[in-house]
Regions:
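Two-component system phosphorelay core
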Residues: 1-57, 61-121
Length: 121
């Protein structure tokens, strides 16, 4: 019997408070998973290329969903990095995102694990 570790960054309880029903949470979790899977590699590429404006657009989207699905510490971290993307030097944004990226990747895995538990094949 495999045991999935408790999520560190994903908060289904918080999502239920915001959304109100389990099916709605699952639908938005699927959207979140697709967004993270598509946008995290793009975000890293934009930061690597020094495209702060492009990175800021994606970070702004991430800032929008984190209060619904994530624990406060990750919400705060996303808000800080998104704020940096508006006025900081590229090197500062790159350094800040290098600390945030592993957390967002962990969140993506937590979302995938939760979805897999809901749809065992």
């Amino acid at each position: 019997m495999s045991h999935t570790p408790a999520p560190v960054y994903l908060s289904i309880g918080r999502a239920m408070e915001f959304i109100g029903d389990g099916q709605g949470v699952l639908t938005l979790l699927q959207t979140l998973q697709e967004t993270l899977s598509n946008d995290l590699p793009r975000l890293q590429a934009l930061i690597d290329q020094g495209d702060v404006l492009g990175a800021q657009r994606i970070l702004h989207q991430l800032k929008g969903f984190t209060p619904v699905f994530c624990v406060d510490s990750l919400v705060d971290h996303v808000v800080r990095v998104e704020g940096l993307s508006k006025h900081a030097e590229t090197s500062a944004l790159r350094a800040a995102y290098s600390q945030l990226a592993p957390q967002l990747e962990a969140l993506r895995h937590e979302v995938l694990a939760h979805l897999a538990l809901q749809n065992p094949t």
